[in-house]
Amino acid sequence: MKTFTKSALFLLWLIPMSFFAQSSVSGTVTDAGNGQPIPGVNIIIKGTTNGTSSDFDGNYVLNGVNNGDIIEFSYVGFIAQEFTYSGTSRIDVALQEDAAELEQVVVIGYGSVRKKDLTGSVTTVTADDFNQGVNASPDQLIKGRTAGVTVIDNGGAPGEGSTIRIRGGSSLNASNNPLIIVDGVPLDPGPGGTRNNLNSINPNDIESFTVLKDASATAIYGFRASNGVIIITTKKGLNTDGKLKFNYNGNVTFSEIVDKIEALDGNQFREYVTANGSQAQIDLLGTENTDWQDEILQNAVSTNHNISLSSGWDWINYRVSLGLLSEEGLIKTDQLDRTSLSTNIRTKFFDNHLRINTNIKTAIEDYTYATTNIGAALGFDPTQPVFQDNNFGNYFQWLDGSGNAIALAGQNPVAALEQNDSRGLIFRSLGNLEVDYKFHFLPELRANLNVGYEIASAKTENITSANSVANAARTGNDSFSRSDQKRENLLFDFYLNYRKDVESLNTVFDVTAGYSYQKFLDSGNNFSRGFDLVEIDNPFNNPREVLLGFFGRATISIADKYIFTGSFRRDATSRFSGLENQWTSSPSGAFSWNAHNENFLKDSNLISQLKFRVSYGVTPQQSIGDATPSLPRILTSDPQSQYQIGQEPDGTPIFISTGLALPYNPDLTWETTTQYNIGLDYGLFDGRVSGSIDVYRKETEDLLFLAALPSGSLSNEDDVNLGNLTNEGLELSLNVTPIQTENLRWQIGGNITFQKGEVTELFAVDNPNFEGFFNTGFVGSNINIQTVGFAPNSYWVFEQIYDANGVPVEGAYVDRNNDNIINEKDKYIYRKPAADFFYGFNTILDYKNWNFSMFWRGSVGNYNYNFVDAGSNGRRILNFQNTLSNTTTDLLQSNFFDGGVDRFSSDYYIQDASFLKLDNISLGYTFKNFLNYKNIDMKLYGTVNNVLIITDYTGIDPEISSGFDSTIYPRPRTYQFGVNLDF
């Protein structure tokens, strides 16, 4: 008993002794390179949650330390260090900068460059910064994330693409799309049927986007890069010593309708027709109150499953991924099912002198297209039922007294969906084989060969039911049409790179020279079967264009402070005729100064980066719609338009094709953009605050434009070089990490872009009274104009007159030239589609295993032409005596009955489309070592997209890339719930 008592007393004595044995340790954390203190360093006892962080002066105090504890010091951009506590009360730590971080490379044209050696305006968005909740379209990943770049959805259909603009584009009528390169292969626009040529890339396979904005960065790609370049790099396998890495990412998405067009309901419609219509029209009214938009719209469900396997050793690694997407549309019957497969294999031989990289990406998109739209639902009589006994599938249709369909009458939108089967099967594959060899006898010299391909085929079919009103004139058979298209894109790139570090001069020389060849081919067949099973077959096979280029680039880096870059490219195209017009040059030059490496800033504890950049470059453009606009051509007729010249002895008719001489312009030449850029990259407090400032000016000459031809010409229009255009802007970006501890990290980021475009010269005509060129026509009128001194696509409109109550007076416009006549001479330039400035900002909060993010986006100064409301008038309802059509509730405000064609050109319909959107909110939780299995992590997440929009615009969505709102496919609000599993 005495022994037990003594033992118990001894144990009780040990408990407080062990408590008092815990100690505190303090010290200072500095940068080993310059001796400056580092604030915000994470200091933690490994295996515990006991930790602290260094203060602004690098000082720290860590309590509760026991002998043998391992203390870890870590900070972004530095190599972590560990110390075993042995009783000392002070530990001072000098962290070394992470060489891998210092040597971080950025993918640019034909190679890569150390981030610190960049001289151009280049932005990289990595997977950590992607927008959340994206299923089908990769371009959505970077929407609003980069200054100077706009990404506007073309609509909300499954797999819908976007209109991407870098610094506002450079052209009026030629392409303004950036060049998109995936793992070294420039993409070609897809064939008909596909909604987005990026859909062959699974968003889950993307590692990063690199955006090249100024001409010094893009000129190496020549004329294809006049509107900027987006380089997509996909994920690769890593060296895991043969261990297999598995990832599964799956989610389910629920989509709902955010808004609808405000159409007259059944009661409002009956009231209007009763008050204003004839007795025959009143007799047409039904008794229903049908919301036709509700009849064709639905809430949708989508699923997305992605699996990837990767592994590797020092000499070989690989990654294989499979994606399965099933996405319903908001319009009934609209559906996309996509299967994607991606494979990457990287090998190294001969002591890393030979590297071979193989990429293959394949996707099959199976579309079921909705065969009606919101506009059709808007215009159908809301007093009629969906169904009615008749010979047209028992859907209500406008019929005459004999039960026949009335010509030109609107079709029941539900019947248009159900009685049409429209499908598309898109196959797309792209890949490349890249061989990189570093010469043994001269290791500074590398040869790189890149052979790539892109093949896209589309088969689209449409079957219209025999009892559809669309087949009313046919003989009881279904109508059928099919289109087969194929596009091929073949690439051959070769370059030599020589990089020499001359230590005696503290200078690095980097020189690249190479050759590029790309060929495009279109082929296909159009087939239709309709009246009495007559079959029409129309094959085609057209070489589209061939592109040749020789390029070179030289970079000199002196003491990591002064970097000079120059590039030159010589290109040829088959679009233009004559050697003088077929060839063009793309020179560029740039200089950057890493001021933070100067002695007067090297020891600064405030400034961690300060880089000044200046650049100049020229990039041409040739992507006008016609593939051969400079060559004389004859258009031969299709089989339906052949001319019979006689017959064979057996009576078989003999046909020959007719021909039409097409207009051409042998003097057509390159559109050329010269760009100037001044930039600043900065970082403060060891990168806790960072950002960039860029000022740019783009001057485009010899604008390519499809312009109207004089009367008597063989065609109404032809391609010409007609004038000059300028675009200038200011881009600002800022990223701040206000809090960074072991358990809590808060990041704030944002960007804003101010932009201004102006047509500076039009020289296609010699007429001082010439108003300008038009490129958006409707109902015999025009709304967008290109004219000197104003922004591209400015609105050309009448000035509406209003009464004392602010109600527009029908057909009344200001006589601006005071000649007592209202005609086109009274129109004026009013507003523009492009924003004065646009912005995006986000916040990310990580607390232990929780992750929260929120992203906002907006624009100011952009105006839309609301063509939906412009068509709202009483005559639209009462135009015929045997049918009725609906319109929007704007009729109740304007009370317009007709107003003539001039109504469409009223500034009443030019509306402020500025907006602020809460694009997405995401919340996730990660289970580390899930179910106590080591190296298995599971993340559960939820994301809401298209959360909130604040705008004065009266349409269903203010984001219209062209500014011309003629109803779009509604963009849904989505709720996504998913799981990500790694082991």
Model regions and ranges:
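Acidic carboxylate motifs that coordinate Ca2+ or other divalent cations, activating on Asp/Glu
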Residues: D819
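Extracytoplasmic gating/loop element in the C-terminal half of outer-membrane beta-barrel translocons
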Residues: V414, S859-V944
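Short, small/polar-rich motifs associated with maturation and membrane association
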Residues: M1-T343, K348-F349, L354-N357, K361-A363, ...
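Extended ligand-binding clefts on enzyme/binding-domain cores
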Residues: G184, G789-P792, V797, D803
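C-terminal extracellular loops and terminal segments
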Residues: K143, D719-T726, P768-Y795, K825, ...
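Short aromatic-centered micro-motifs
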Residues: D31, I43, F73, I180, ...
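Glycine-rich, aromatic-lined ligand/substrate-binding cores of catalytic
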Residues: P833-Y865
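Extracellular/periplasmic, surface-exposed regions of secreted and cell-surface proteins
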Residues: F130, N135, N177, V273-T274, ...
